[in-house]
Amino acid sequence: METKAPHLDARLAACAAYVRPGARVADVGCDHGKLAARLALEGCRVIGTDIHAAPLETARATCAAAGCADRVDLRLGDGLAPLEAGEADDIVMAGISAETILHILDAAGWVRRKGIRLILCAATKTPLLRRELCRRGFALEDETPVVAAGRVYTVLCAGYTGEEREPDGEFCLVGLSAAKPHAARLRDDTAAKLKNSCADCAAGNNRKPGGCWPGCAGWN
């Protein structure tokens, strides 16, 4: 039977590019299952998780249509909770907030092991994600800025080293993306968000800890 790999947008394609050949992959918040199906067709074993049952059914249909349902294990649950330590080498989280990504990582202590690769694309607050990864002993290995649906996103590739550090504001803002395609647009977008965030801080409207940007009074 002829199979057809699902089309991936720029964000998911960049995530897929960081997955190691033949890896055991956890696709957290797998949603429609397109990334899981594509990776399975490329030779990976995939565990897809989602906190809601409906997206898992959509993912199941996607994988069946692609002819790879036998290589994708879909599990209902929050974040990495449905997995046991040792079941995944590469962990993908895309389309969720930085705070949610950090919550998921904090709840799964087994991810703090050398050799596990994190592939992360936060929907919001990438500077916060960079900072908190460094504080938790993870090191950024590479980044890819992409444009999807008219917005610039950055896909981070990171691994655990155990060396906790406090990155400076410049690193939090641009990370390893300074010389990459779309870097200029990324800087412009980041500068605009920084300006708005500083204005919110000055007005006392910043309600979320860590919700500011480097240089803001609330950046803690």
Give the role of each language-model region.
Residues 22-31:
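Conserved class I S-adenosyl-L-methionine
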Residues 1-22, 37, 57-85:
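S-adenosyl-L-methionine
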Residues 32-44:
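Conserved SAM-binding loop of SAM-dependent methyltransferases across substrates and taxa
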Residues 2-10, 99-220:
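Class I S-adenosyl-L-methionine
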Residues 88-95:
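Short SAM/SAH-binding signature in class I
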Residues 52-54:
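Conserved SAM/SAH-binding beta-strand->alpha-helix loop
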Residues 45-50:
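Conserved SAM-binding motif I beta-strand of class I
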